[in-house]
Amino acid sequence: MTPEEVSREVRRIEITTRHLVRDIVAGEYSSAFRGRGVEFAEVREYQPGDDIRTIDWNVTARLGAAYVKRYLEERELSVLFIVDMSASGGFGTRLRTKGQLGAEVAAVLALAAARNNDRIGGLFFTDRVEYHLGPAKGRRHVLRFISDLLAFAPAGTGTDLGAALAELEPTLRRRAIIFVLSDFMATGYESVLGRIARRHDVVGLHLIDPRERELPAAGLVTLWDPETGAWRRVDTGDAELRAHFARRTEEFDRGLDRLMRERGADLLRLETGRPYAEPLLSFFRRRERMLWR
């Protein structure tokens, strides 16, 4: 993208997603990540959009106005986006590619976090770490992150999520929310993911495309692996091959679900051919219920 195209796309995302950003912030965003184990900091007067469960009823009764409790994480929380920029992100057969879906979802979540006065940071990776932006607050910073995300042209093509998480780990001095946006077609990241998830909120956003889940019966086709450059000719008219492909996909999904659960991370699947607003809102509602039950 040219700088002018990037600016237009940033503005488009801001305009078309502003209601979603508002709904995320006004809904369960804060309570979905600030549940147990937070440190009390102070009380302040209630403001529209505050979680009513944080109202300090003793102070409210004494002063005759609604006051809420604030916690340390409300002022110290960082939201980090670990974004897979490998070549497989260029695949998409519906509304957008996986990479475009990941970029827009990361932009929406970054805008929501900025509106919540959280710090925003990012790390982009392929088979190497290619970009690392330290967390900071402010509209200018979040717009820089989104612009960099949209304009980024990676040097690598492969995927090494383990290397990305290993570089991130020593920089995490305070509790953080970490969104990992990837198709997770990688290995060797399990241990470092578990270490990070023990101290931080880790959410995997699994970016998928329907054609990666089910092959059409289109006869002989040539498939290309964008990360390795390998070509393979297959007969998609073979029902047994298509069934095997579908089974392998299901096995991959179950394995990823199990891995995330065992390592203490959360997981949400987002598909290139479907709107992502409701899945995001449902995810925050589900996390909120789990933390406050």
Which functions belong to the PLM regions below?
Residues 1-139, 167, 177-180, 186-187, ...:
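An amphipathic, basic-hydrophobic helix/alpha-beta surface used to engage anionic
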Residues 180-181, 272:
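Small/polar loops that bind or transfer phosphate-bearing groups
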Residues 100, 155-162, 247-250:
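Conserved phosphate-coordination/catalytic loops
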